Amino acid sequence: MGDNKNNGDSGKLLYCSFCGKSQHEVRKLIAGPSVYVCDECVELCNDIIREEIKEISPKRDNDKLPTPHELRAHLDDYVIGQDRAKKVLSVAVYNHYKRLRNSSPKDGVELGKSNILLIGPTGSGKTLLAETLARSLNVPFTMADATTLTEAGYVGEDVENIIQKLLQKCDYDVEKAQRGIVYIDEIDKISRKSDNPSITRDVSGEGVQQALLKLIEGTVAAVPPQGGRKHPQQEFLQVDTSKILFICGGAFAGLEKVIEQRAHVGSGIGFGAQVKGEKDKATISQTLSQVEPEDLVKYGLIPEFIGRLPVVATLTELDEEALVQILSEPKNALTKQYNALFEMEGVELEFREDALKAIAHKAMSRKTGARGLRSIVEGILLDTMYDIPSIEGVVKAVVDESVVNGESAPILIYERNEAQAASGEQ
């Protein structure tokens, strides 16, 4: 086969055997035994084959959908606590993908879309829950920060950029993207700035909620393809967002006060009032678990937006015991990750129980939840990770409470010490 751009050996003008265009009308003309094909026809054939493969390949729906119990078990491997939220998420995600598989309505009953709202303090595991679910289902996942979003036409990130990010995660495969999960963080930060609609435009608050409405409920978003046009006749990729699961999360600081105000209405005043003692007061997590749509409206979310997020799960604040478990128990626990890093240098890393408790205590005092654990561990091990590659004979590093409190450096055990200890035992 040869690439003929000039006239043939005989000086004769060559034509594509398929479309009839001459070699001067196309970029490339590929020659075969007494036949020629141009680059445009090759591209057209590729497109036809790709479309046919797409029509056949989505039958991967035949793969068994994990049950809510199986989804919950997978979450348990990576996320500590939050039992109620795990159950709510597992059922909602299972029902969403069940709805996608049974798209033809039975007896005219169309299944509604159930997007999810996660309410919980910073570092309680909202993002990790969404990410772990996407990984267990092997579907594309992307995250967006609501604070960077603005209405179309204003400086900032357009809401449709979220779909662009999802497409990037699956190499612009629209079919895959339409089965994906989108997590929008800091959703509480786009609450309306006051109860009364303002005369001035609120482009990063209520305006963004309005912009997100259609996207979350389901619309056909027009997204520019990677590297310009995919086909000469097509400028945008059409993505049906009604098949995408949206999970929104936020800390909703101060929401508990809104709930308490509602709960206290009707409790009586004067001699008929019910006075609660200190020990009768509910914790913030207990109060948040009683959230109602009206509380979210009072907080600053518009009713239409709340209506698009019918499944609400509240996460509890992690206590010190839970943080200790997070450090050591999950499959990708922090201590296991750092142990793997040290193993690459041929060194075993040991965290003693008192060290784990001290790390958890420090994270609690910083009020950063599980999110602050990594920075604490990184700070403790920084000097050791800097020195170990240059020191020979180290076989073990031990971290105890005094190391966490900054009173001493991690204990380094050398090969010769190990040998002496072994001979002493004999």
From Swiss-Prot:
Q: Which residues form the ClpX-type ZB domain?
A: 4-57
One of its Pfam families is AAA_2
GO BP of this protein: cell division; proteolysis involved in protein catabolic process
The record's GO CC annotations read:
HslUV protease complex
Q: Does the keyword Transcription apply?
A: no
Alphabetized UniProt keyword annotations:
ATP-binding, Chaperone, Metal-binding, Nucleotide-binding, Zinc
Superkingdom of origin organism: Bacteria
List the Gene3D superfamilies hit by this protein, alphabetically: 1.10.8.60, ClpX chaperone, C4-type zinc finger domain (6.20.220.10), P-loop containing nucleotide triphosphate hydrolases (3.40.50.300)
- Residues annotated as binding ATP are P121, T122, G123, S124, G125, K126, T127, L128
Q: Which GO terms describe its molecular function?
A: ATP binding; ATP hydrolysis activity; ATP-dependent protein folding chaperone; protein dimerization activity; unfolded protein binding; zinc ion binding
Q: What does this protein do?
A: ATP-dependent specificity component of the Clp protease. It directs the protease to specific substrates. Can perform chaperone functions in the absence of ClpP.
Q: Which family does it belong to?
A: Belongs to the ClpX chaperone family.
What is the designated name of this protein?
A: ATP-dependent Clp protease ATP-binding subunit ClpX
Provenance organism:
Shewanella sp. (strain ANA-3)
Query: Lineage of the native species?
Result: Bacteria, Pseudomonadati, Pseudomonadota, Gammaproteobacteria, Alteromonadales
